[in-house]
A protein has these predicted regions:
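OB-fold ssDNA-binding interfaces and closely related basic DNA-contact patches used
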Residues: 1-65
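Intrinsically disordered, low-complexity acidic/Q/S/K-rich activation/interaction tracts characteristic
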Residues: 12-13, 87, 91, 165
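Long, contiguous hydrophobic alpha-helical segments, chiefly transmembrane helices and signal peptides
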Residues: 18, 75, 111-113, 192
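Short, surface-exposed beta-strand/loop "edge" segments at domain boundaries and coil↔beta transitions
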Residues: 23-26, 66-71, 120-124, 138-140
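Non-membrane alpha-helical secondary structure
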Residues: 32-35, 84, 107
Length: 192
């Protein structure tokens, strides 16, 4: 049901398998989910400038797949290159303690982030997250969108990316009554 809600809503989805760097399994000091700069720019246009050092905005992060508290994640443009230093990157940080995004056990897990789009073109204010916990969950998603290979990502409007899921759930018009024996074995065209 979560996927159907996302597929039919005004969301931008970002889908990937969590890397060891994403989850902190490498032991690096910069634990955090990699999201390409262009996606951060699209979702958070207000921070895409160099008028001030490190502009940022907060976003409510809810994890539907796991029982953990919501967090106030932070979309930030580290733009110190324009202020005499070296950094020039955009990130989403502060996912919160206990987030499955930062659990080394989830390295390799198929993960979906559904950012609610602002209808006026402003910043996204909420993201709903699903980190798959089983091969069955992954199969449901990959049946609709294709295989997600580690190191690749899929992103775009939810209706376009997950459109196959929403089509599968369309109600059927039952104008005609199907004969009882057809429920057991549907006849061929010649038999009809």
């Amino acid at each position: 049901n979560w996927l159907l809600e996302i597929a039919g809503g005004n969301y931008f989805v970002y889908i990937k398998r969590l890397s060891a760097n994403d989850t902190g399994a490498t032991g690096g000091h910069q634990v955090g989910l990699y999201i390409p700069s262009g996606i951060v720019e699209k979702l958070f246009p207000s921070i895409n400038h160099t008028r001030e050092l490190n502009p940022s905005v907060f976003i409510t992060a809810h994890v539907s797949s796991h029982d953990c508290p919501d967090s106030e994640a932070r979309a930030i443009y580290y733009n110190s290159r324009y202020f005499g230093k070296t950094r020039n990157e955009k990130r989403i940080t502060r996912w919160g303690r206990g987030s499955p995004l930062q659990d080394p056990e989830n390295t390799g897990a198929l993960t979906l982030l559904a950012f609610r789009l602002n209808e006026d073109g402003g910043d996204s204010t909420a993201v709903d997250i699903w980190v798959c916990v089983s091969p069955d969950e992954e199969d449901i998603i990959e049946t609709a969108i294709g295989e997600v290979i580690p190191g690749t990502l899929i992103s775009g409007p939810a209706g376009r990316i997950l459109g196959g899921l929403s089509l599968q759930q369309m109600p059927v018009n039952h104008k005609y009554t199907i004969p009882e024996d057809w429920q057991q074995r549907f006849p061929s065209g010649n038999e009809i």
